[in-house]
Amino acid sequence: TAEGVKKITGYTTDIITDVTLDWLKNGRDEDKPFFVMSQHKAPHRNWQPGPKYLTKYDGIEITEPDTLRDDYKTRTSAASTQAMTIRNHLSSNDLKLRTPGNLTPEQKAKWDAAYGPKNDAFRKAKLEGKELVRWKYQRYIKDYLRCVAAVDDGIGQILKYLDEENLADNTIVIYSSDQGFYLGDHGWYDKRWMYEESLRMPLIVRWPGVIKPGGVDRHLVQNLDYAQTFLDVAGIDIPDDMQGRS
């Protein structure tokens, strides 16, 4: 911050939400328009869920993508020699077979209670082949979705604040990401490859009075267009040396 380094203990997703709300409530000039970016990273590797959702989806089997066991026979050799398969390349940290070293005692107790019994059962099972891939996929996708659940909570809190403060009808909300992601598609996690699952990403806009709720626009947009769009909406001239367009 402008005042120096500030250390906050907690789950990063919750902290980002809390800091955003604190600025909206206490940090802005309420007589002026505002612009705030609330940027979450939890769904990024290594998909570390917060204490609230450590056991969410336990006892549920997530449907596997049809291409989870893709053999890449119709692709170039590079597709089969990459290092991002669920079968071979998820680390013990990715799979939560090791307890993170950055937890408080209270967080560690909750973590061990959630993952300890399941990890013990996995080690005893000595899975191989398709069964091992199935287990890894379930661990990966559930942790990913646990992270997303916390992000959903945070976004919901921000939208609720806008409603409660009568700001929703005069505020543009834009929800997006930096890229798509493989959730077991082609047997992969991560991004890297320009297939549809990685190339496409969400761009959801709530603009009361301008964009009809539920509408779909199929024009192509890139994330290098975002800054120009923000400037245009704010009535600020767009520098000629910026790429992209509003």
Question: What are the roles of these predicted feature ranges?
Answer:
Residues A2-T12, L24-K32, M37-V221, V233-M242:
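Active-site-proximal cap/lid insertion segments
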Residues V19, R200, Q222-V233, S246:
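Generic recognition of well-ordered alpha-helical segments
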